Amino acid sequence: AVPEGNPKGIESFDQLAELLKSGDVLLAIGNSDVPVGQYTQKIFAYYGLDESAMTDCLTYGNNVKEVTTQVSEAAVDCGIIYATDAFSAGLKVVDSATAEMCGQVIYPAAVLKGEKEEAAQAFLDYLQTADAMSVFESVGFSPAN
């Protein structure tokens, strides 16, 4: 995602990788101990980028919200965040990572045994309907397979 106006004109991960190699960009990413940071490290590996060689190009957040804030405040040229966080913050998503780049982000759901098992199953069933999928898509999620 990029800040309002996209000052660096970043339009793709390919372009971002080239800017990182040249040292001509400031990118916000999550720390390596949080999921968004772990996905980012996979993207770096996909592009053959060495994080330790890019220290002047990177800022870190303790979580995806901190990375999103850095982008929203235009403290950085771009940030690697989830599309849903970009949507919530009103940021422009210029490219999306593919499953080949970093694997697929999956949010599992299950029904546990307990006194509200029927209600939980009904809710899980609803989450798999076309109506629910359209709500998910409207806020940046991809449909479940």
Labelled PLM ranges:
Residues 2-145:
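Exported/periplasmic ABC-transporter solute-binding proteins
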